[in-house]
């Protein structure tokens, strides 16, 4: 019989070469992984710049313009927070043509050694179809846009609420819906219920809240999915009375608040209006009713598109 001390020595003699081999394998594969990630980062960098739409600044009346536009000279909505109609003047800026997708955001999380988002069972169906807008909480949206700024050397950030509405209204015109013709036409420029199920068949038990991007025509400015396909976070804190005190020049919302504004909507005519305001907690924790366990801290239907806070057009 082999003494126990010799058995331990024999096992250790086998273990050391095996550990060395595993270490060498990992080391040899790491450069390939880094090279692959570097390629994805470079591709995203080029995409982020080429995706920009330059929006020339100007002056417009922000808010529910029904009293000066509708036949009855009445507001289009009963919402108090999108009133009063007030003048706003904006400097020029650029806005992303498309929303951030899960593929885009995966590059950000991988590059920063973070866990990928939306890996829960309820979220995964949206990942299984390419080019679907990512559901993000506000801190994630903000961090992603600022990271693009570090990546490109450009002042990327979230758009302000005023910038978003000005863009949705084709530089402040009296446009009701930010579609190709200013109309809400389900099946032609907005996804109808049956189309949503067809475009995202991985979602089995309910109508998808988002669908792949750029299925329908862009707005006259060249912006896709400003309504009818999820919402966009903006920079501003929310205040119901902000329009009463908003500065005219480049407003950025209240200094502080409890909820953040998001604009656009997935499938509703009224909330899809260019001037309709919505807000929610920046990082809402959604819990299981029975256990109280948090299963997500983001809404699948609120995402982001980034802006470049610069007065000149950017090119790749």
Question: Across the structure, where does each feature detected by a protein language model lie?
Answer:
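Functional-site microenvironments in short loops/helix caps that host divalent-cation chemistry
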Residues: 55, 61, 66-70, 122-123, ...
């Amino acid at each position: 019989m082999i003494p126990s001390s010799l058995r331990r020595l024999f096992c250790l003699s086998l273990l050391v070469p095996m550990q060395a081999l595993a270490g060498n394998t990992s080391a040899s594969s790491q450069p390939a992984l880094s090279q692959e990630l570097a390629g994805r980062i470079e591709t995203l960098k080029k995409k982020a710049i080429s995706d920009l739409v330059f929006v020339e600044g100007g002056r417009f009346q922000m808010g529910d313009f029904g009293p000066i536009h509708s036949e009855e000279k009445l507001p289009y909505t009963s919402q108090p927070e999108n009133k009063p109609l007030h003048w706003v003047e904006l400097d020029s800026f650029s806005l992303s043509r498309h929303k951030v997708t899960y593929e885009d955001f995966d590059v950000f999380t991988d590059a920063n050694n973070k866990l990928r988002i939306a890996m829960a069972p309820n979220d995964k169906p949206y990942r299984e179809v390419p080019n679907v807008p990512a559901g993000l909480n506000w801190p994630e949206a903000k961090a992603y846009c600022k990271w693009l700024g570090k990546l490109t050397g450009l002042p990327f950030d979230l758009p302000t609420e005023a910038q978003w509405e000005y863009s949705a209204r084709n530089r402040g015109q009296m446009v009701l819906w930010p579609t190709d013709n200013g109309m809400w036409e389900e099946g032609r420029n907005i996804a109808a219920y049956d189309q949503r199920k067809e475009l995202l068949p991985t979602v089995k038990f309910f109508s998808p809240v988002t669908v792949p991007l750029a299925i329908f025509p862009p707005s006259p400015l060249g912006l896709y999915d400003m309504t009818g396909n999820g919402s966009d976070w903006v920079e501003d804190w929310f205040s119901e009375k902000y329009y009463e005190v908003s500065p005219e020049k480049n407003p950025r919302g209240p200094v502080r608040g409890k909820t953040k504004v998001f604009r656009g909507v997935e499938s509703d005519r009224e909330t899809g209006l260019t001037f309709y305001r919505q807000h929610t907690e920046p990082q809402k924790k959604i819990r299981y009713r029975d256990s109280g366990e948090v299963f997500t801290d983001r809404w699948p239907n609120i995402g982001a598109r980034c802006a470049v806070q610069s007065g000149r057009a950017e090119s790749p």
